[in-house]
Regions:
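Substrate-binding/active-site groove segments that recognize
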Residues: 60, 67-90, 99-111, 123, ...
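A cross-kingdom feature marking charged/low-complexity
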Residues: 45, 153-157
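Export/targeting segments at the very N-terminus of extracytoplasmic proteins
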Residues: 4-64, 83, 97, 104
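Flexible, glycine-rich active-site loops centered on histidine and acidic residues
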Residues: 132-138
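Solvent-exposed, acidic/flexible segments
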Residues: 29-37, 46-47, 51, 70-78, ...
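Amphipathic alpha-helical polymerization modules
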Residues: 38, 42, 94, 105, ...
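Short, solvent-exposed positions on alpha-helices
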Residues: 52-55, 119-123
Length: 157
């Protein structure tokens, strides 16, 4: 993370090396502050998505950093793109509550769209539903393939 701009270089492997001072990482890599944990649990309950799955996405997207912005403009802990954030009613993508709730709603919609298939939902979260439709599954983009594998590895750990 660049301390002056709070940006990071979005890599195929996610946002490795980024951490927030409030994050406590343990063996599974999905442990976060109690405040964030409470938000993940509320979002999981509200949108019917496993809290561990939401945390796996956040771990891969931002390493639980609430203030980061990717090269492509994705913002906050769940790395919402501005247009997606707006469509989800997120007015401040750096607010952890709004961002996690928006990300949970979005992945819930993708899970519904793909009949509960987590890999396809993740591919759509990362590369867009249009690309999933175009390629009839996970797109042949290294970034997306690595992203799906990494999130699922965190989730299954």
């Amino acid at each position: 993370i660049s301390s002056d701009t709070n940006t990071y270089n979005a890599a195929a492997s996610g946002a490795s090396g980024i951490s927030s001072s409030s994050v406590k990482l343990e063996a599974s890599g999905l442990s976060c502050s109690a405040d964030l944990d409470a938000i993940f649990n509320e979002a999981a309950s509200k949108y019917g998505v496993d809290a561990k799955f939401l945390k796996a996405i956040a771990k891969c997207e931002s390493d639980f950093s609430t203030e980061c912005t990717s090269r492509s403009g994705a913002m906050g802990i769940m790395q919402l793109m501005p247009q997606t954030a707006a469509s989800l009613g997120v007015t401040n993508a750096y607010d952890p509550y709004q961002n996690i709730m928006g990300g949970a709603r979005y992945i819930s919609e993708k899970l519904t769209q793909y009949n509960g298939d987590k890999s396809l939902a993740l591919a759509a979260y990362n590369a867009g539903s249009g690309n999933v439709a175009k390629y009839g599954g996970i797109p042949p983009f290294k970034e997306t393939q690595n992203y799906v594998a990494k999130v699922m590895a965190y989730y299954n750990s």
